[in-house]
């Protein structure tokens, strides 16, 4: 099954003829926000990920890294299937970096959900050359749910869109921080 997923991944990423061998590429694929920006090629954009136990919310930035928009919610089945869909969308939308929501506890510690997000990123980097960064996603789903409630969105519609909107919320936070960093640069 892993070989089948690897073949699909190699086919969906342009200019990728084989997956990286060994562990030399590990840890180098996880970047700071600034490094992720520097690694971006012209015309590429970022994809935000909100990792849940049952779903993965996805969002896209525009090519100017100004605005994040909800894209899709993947219903999780197994890692290889989930990543194959993720990388298919990454190739389609010319993704140059992933912004992965890191669910840090309110006191700043990392619990099981944050460890799960880090494990997902480690496994993803074994299959993809696309760099990633983490973004503190504390309260992102709660903020989106509150916004949807304020907009009088039905329960069914909220359930349908909350994950991809949370991914957009996460990505937008990272984009705004990037702008802040760039504004302070000499």
Residue ranges of model-derived segments:
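Phosphate- and other anionic-substrate recognition elements at nucleic-acid/protein interfaces
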Residues: 22-49, 54, 59-186
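Cationic, low-complexity basic patches in intrinsically disordered or flexible, solvent-exposed regions
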Residues: 4-7, 19
């Amino acid at each position: 099954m892993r070989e089948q997923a690897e073949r699909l991944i190699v086919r969906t990423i342009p200019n990728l003829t084989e997956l990286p061998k060994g562990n030399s590429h590990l840890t180098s694929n996880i970047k700071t926000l600034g490094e992720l920006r520097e690694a971006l090629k012209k015309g590429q954009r970022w994809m935000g990920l909100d990792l849940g136990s049952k779903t993965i919310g996805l969002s896209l930035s525009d090519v100017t890294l100004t605005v994040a928009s909800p894209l899709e919610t993947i219903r999780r089945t197994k890692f290889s299937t989930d990543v194959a869909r993720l990388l298919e969308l990454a190739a389609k939308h010319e993704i140059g970096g992933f912004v992965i929501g890191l669910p840090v506890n309110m006191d700043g510690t990392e619990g099981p959900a944050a460890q799960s997000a880090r494990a997902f990123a480690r496994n993803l980097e074994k299959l993809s050359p696309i760099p990633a960064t983490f973004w503190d996603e504390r309260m992102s789903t709660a903020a989106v749910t509150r916004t949807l409630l304020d907009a009088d969105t039905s329960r069914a519609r909220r359930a349908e869109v909350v994950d991809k909107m949370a991914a957009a919320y996460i990505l937008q936070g990272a984009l705004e921080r990037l702008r802040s960093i760039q504004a302070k640069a000499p």
